[in-house]
């Protein structure tokens, strides 16, 4: 790229300076590595833990939709990140660093769609867990219907909303990155992000209350069958809330930092190239989230499965030795006493 700067569009010069900015460049490589690394825990969790888990089919359908969307997002963004890292090596001119408008618009549309689909699933998971709590005694017998219907509905709803926003998108030039949202729809897209963040925050608070209710129900039932049913609901609810917590933390941080940098970043960075580099660096947080949620889910599932086994074994022992065992012992003595009294009365 030894071309003269004369008659070169400003966008091409900006793309060149940003592409070789050390902060931007290093974080683009970091994003590529994290997206590639996220494929392994996500695939392992879905195939070898989630599909083989004892979760009810409704919850399992929603979790498959949630983690499946994240996995597809990682694959699509991995391709896009590879293109962004590759362009500086193969470009002969500064303008070659810009992604062509039609590819940029398609890539950004797919990115926003796949990034926002998982934000709907925590809300549906909490709703499904609420139904499971209310029907805890016989929920395991409920047929699998609610989960798949909710999963399909959420994907279609998000697709409709994203297309509604992108209907007004005006893309006349290329972009150095697929993740930079077109200026013509940036405000609406960020409002959508804020709305989903608020909903997810309220949802997490409600999920926490739901978990406490599950714990109370589990303690209030003394029969072995009821304990087994409630333990299953409690464990799966606790796992879901742990995943929701990771989701809200990363998505909330990403949304907050991205919006602050876009609208207030110029107060901290006078050089637009430095600001663009920092914005691009923080946008790689989503790849970190994809990796973190995969690893965290494998870990959470392992921990709660072990705790569930210990809890069930403890319940079985309690029936014989604990408070329930004492009640059973008193009942047995009372029955023996009644039978003895009845025999004595008959003999007189």
UniProtKB/Swiss-Prot annotation:
It is found in: Membrane. Signal peptide: none annotated. Its main location: membrane. GO terms for molecular function: transmembrane signaling receptor activity. GO terms for biological process: sensory perception of chemical stimulus. Keywords: Membrane, Transmembrane, Transmembrane helix. The chain crosses the membrane at residues 31-51, 63-83, 107-127, 145-165, 191-211, 241-261, 280-300. GO terms for cellular component: membrane. Coiled coil: none annotated. It comes from the Eukaryota. It is a multi-pass membrane protein. PANTHER family: SERPENTINE RECEPTOR CLASS BETA-1-RELATED-RELATED, SERPENTINE RECEPTOR CLASS BETA-7. Belongs to the nematode receptor-like protein srb family. This is Serpentine receptor class beta-7. It comes from Caenorhabditis elegans. The gene is srb-7.
């Amino acid at each position: 790229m030894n071309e003269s700067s004369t008659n070169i569009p400003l966008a091409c010069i900006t793309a060149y300076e940003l592409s070789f900015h050390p902060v931007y460049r290093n974080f683009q490589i970091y994003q590529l590595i994290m997206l590639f690394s996220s494929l392994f825990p996500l695939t392992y969790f879905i195939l070898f833990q989630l599909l083989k888990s004892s979760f009810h089919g409704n919850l399992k359908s929603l979790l498959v939709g949630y983690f499946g969307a994240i996995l597809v997002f990682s694959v699509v963004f991995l391709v896009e990140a590879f293109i962004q890292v590759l362009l500086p090596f193969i470009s002969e001119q500064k303008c070659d660093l810009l992604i062509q408008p039609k590819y940029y618009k398609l890539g950004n549309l797919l990115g926003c769609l796949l990034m926002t689909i998982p934000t709907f699933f925590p809300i549906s998971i909490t709703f499904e867990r609420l139904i499971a709590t209310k029907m805890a005694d016989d929920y395991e017998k409920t047929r699998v219907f609610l989960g798949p219907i909710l999963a399909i509905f959420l994907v279609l709803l998000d697709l409709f909303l994203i297309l509604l926003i992108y209907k007004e998108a005006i893309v006349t030039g290329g972009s150095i990155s697929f993740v930079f949202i077109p200026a013509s729809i940036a405000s609406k897209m960020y409002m959508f992000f804020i709305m989903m963040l608020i909903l997810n925050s309220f949802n997490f608070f409600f999920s926490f209350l739901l978990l406490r209710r599950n714990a109370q129900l589990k303690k209030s039932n003394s029969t072995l069958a009821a304990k087994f049913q409630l333990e299953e609901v409690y464990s799966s609810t606790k796992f879901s809330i742990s995943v929701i917590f990771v989701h809200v933390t990363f998505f909330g941080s990403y949304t907050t930092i991205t919006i602050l940098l876009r609208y207030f970043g110029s107060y901290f960075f006078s050089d637009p190239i430095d600001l663009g580099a920092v914005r691009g660096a923080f946008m790689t947080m989503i790849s970190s989230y994809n990796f973190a949620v995969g690893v965290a889910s494998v870990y959470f599932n392992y921990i709660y499965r072990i705790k569930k086994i210990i809890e069930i074994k403890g319940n079985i022992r309690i029936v014989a030795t604990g408070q329930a065992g004492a009640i059973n012992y008193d009942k047995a003595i009372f029955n023996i006493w009644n039978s003895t009294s009845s025999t004595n009365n008959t003999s007189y």
